[in-house]
């Protein structure tokens, strides 16, 4: 993660807030905790079909995890690690992000922000490495996403709103001026969208009692360019999906995430009882 939330190694104390493991390491931890479901974006799934070979690999991985302090000498995960992995597997709400990075050779970084009860966890996958980070709720969703993406100057543009399908068909500045933009802003939008350094697509999901999950059909977005950061937010109006683009301030990123979460059955990041208690 590139933001202010530092990752740490698991140890013997009670202040463990982060851990870095391989995908094989995560599978071993999940097996110890009898967990099998994880956010699709992270791609955490069994990768060695041959049982005898898997046992050999997992034995070595378990030894490495024990040396790292992630597993104790009885083979059980550190309590803080177990809590983070449980949150990842059984989250009440999840934001799932795919981050395409032209600025570092076109790699895709996958990340999630998960909430289970009061506990919030960020997980980032880069290649075969996975970083889990426990984070305080007061950081806020925009702060948690920014912890992954890093900060950036917001693009100096006017807001742009339109029907999502129609905006998607715009390929030049002249078409964008139909939405009330000045020619200068329309050209700037065109330059940003056609030549991004990186872009992020974020969807949300909600876990229901009984274990079923609902995913949003639309996504929020973050786009970084030489001209600064843009955020995009989806909004359902009268059965029509609209998209809005705004300068990429943290406040506007929070607006985008709130708008995305409104598309879930609950309409929010918190359960109603939690929101009422906080209010």
Curated annotation (Swiss-Prot):
GO terms for cellular component: cytoplasm. The keyword Cytoplasm applies. It is found in: Cytoplasm. It comes from the Bacteria. Keywords: Chaperone, Cytoplasm. Its main location: cytoplasm. It holds the Pfam family ESX-1_EspG. InterPro entries: EspG. Interacts specifically with ESX-1-dependent PE/PPE proteins. Belongs to the EspG family. Specific chaperone for cognate PE/PPE proteins. Plays an important role in preventing aggregation of PE/PPE dimers. This is ESX-1 secretion-associated protein EspG1. The gene is espG1.
